[in-house]
Regions:
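Short, low-complexity disordered leader/linker segments with a strong preference
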Residues: 1-30, 55, 82, 104-111, ...
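Short beta-strand elements in bilobed, periplasmic/extracellular small-molecule ligand-binding domains
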Residues: 55-67, 154-157, 178-196
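Hydrophobic alpha-helical segments within soluble ligand-binding/sensing domains
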Residues: 74, 129-155, 167-168, 196-200, ...
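Hydrophobic alpha-helical
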Residues: 79-108, 174, 192-253
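Flexible loop/hinge segments that line or gate small-molecule binding clefts
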Residues: 96-135, 139, 154, 160, ...
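Hinge/cleft segment of the Venus flytrap/periplasmic-binding protein
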Residues: 158, 162, 166, 177, ...
Length: 319
């Protein structure tokens, strides 16, 4: 009799298991990260943070977005997330004005949204998490002046695209400090289009057109390695001070070999992890982050601190 009861109970549990799994899947939160560059090295660092948060906090994460910067495609992906009734959305303000309406749609659907890296000031969002771009530029400019040691700065800038808000603000931060120096000259601003080959060709043309250039500032991750490649090929290593952005592998290698002077780091891991953490906490408790605008921090990385700078960047308890 006891064996029969045990057998029946085992069969009931076996039959119930699929339903329990379905119920758990239905209860699992779904958070969508709409990135501006789905496979770009620096955004893959954000994905690493996002995936780590998913593992730690138990939500299902979707990583979506265009392969090249395209605000319209990002808007479409946000609309898809809204239609799928995602529990939360993370995105970046590539074209803030154009993205306001879709943020309002998310709000109307009851979906909390966190903006990272560059804000959408007029749009409804739970919070913003990103580098203060003008502060980053100003800090970078001070480091460049230290390296120039009195030489007059003849500066060229490279951004991803000219209408990319965060890039413009970073350049303005550099300009606000460098323009105070005697002999400062802003030679040009060129685009990388978020493409390494395009960046290389642009730097080649730039150094040919402006042989007086002694400072090359990148506010797009691929632009720094592209500049280092061209400087080496054109024999300009000892003439041009290269300031890169982000700590992708090529840039770190170029600092180690002395081609690139420094890079301005942004904590993209934190942007992926903490943005998701805020959404989960808000969904569970209704409590929003204490501040609407949050600085994810920045640091100048040179040969002096290259071996130690990243120790705390992936530790939430250190943020």
């Amino acid at each position: 009799m006891k064996k029969g009861i045990a057998l029946i109970l085992a069969m009931v549990l076996l039959l119930a298991a699929p339903a329990m799994c379905v119920a758990q899947a239905e209860q699992q939160k779904h958070i969508v990260f709409v990135t501006p560059l789905i496979a770009h090295p620096v955004w893959l660092i954000a994905k690493e943070g996002f995936d780590a948060a998913a593992a730690d906090l138990g939500f299902r994460g979707s990583w979506v977005g265009p392969s090249t910067i395209d605000a319209n495609e990002m808007i479409k992906q946000i609309e898809v997330a809204i239609a799928e009734k995602a529990d939360g959305i993370i995105t970046q303000g590539i074209n803030p004005e154009a993205m306001v309406p879709v943020l309002k749609k998310a709000e109307e659907a009851g979906i909390p949204l966190v903006v990272v890296n560059s804000d959408i000031p007029e749009g409804p969002r739970l919070a913003y998490l990103g580098t203060n771009p003008t502060n980053l530029g100003a800090i970078g400019a001070e480091a460049i002046l230290s390296k120039l040691d009195g030489a007059e700065p003849k500066v060229a800038y490279m951004c991803a695209v000219l209408d990319y808000q965060i890039g413009r603000e970073m350049i303005e931060g550099y300009r606000s400090v460098l323009s105070q120096e005697e002999g400062y000259e802003e030679l040009t601003i060129v685009e990388s289009k978020s493409d390494m080959l395009t960046a290389v060709q642009a730097w080649e043309n730039l150094f040919t057109t402006y042989p007086e250039c002694n400072v090359a500032i990148s506010v797009a991750a691929e632009a720094g390695p592209a500049c280092a490649k061209v400087v080496n090929e054109m024999g300009l290593k000892d003439k041009v001070v290269i300031m890169a952005i982000d700590d992708i592998e090529e840039t770190i290698d170029n600092i180690k070999d002395g081609t690139t002077y420094a890079t301005m780091t942004q904590n993209f891991f934190r942007k992926g992890y903490e943005a998701a953490q805020w959404l989960v906490e808000y969904i569970d408790t209704g409590v929003a982050p204490a501040e609407l605008l949050n600085d994810s921090g920045t640091m100048v990385v040179t040969l002096d601190n290259i071996e130690v700078y990243s120790e705390d960047m992936k530790k939430p308890e250190k943020w």
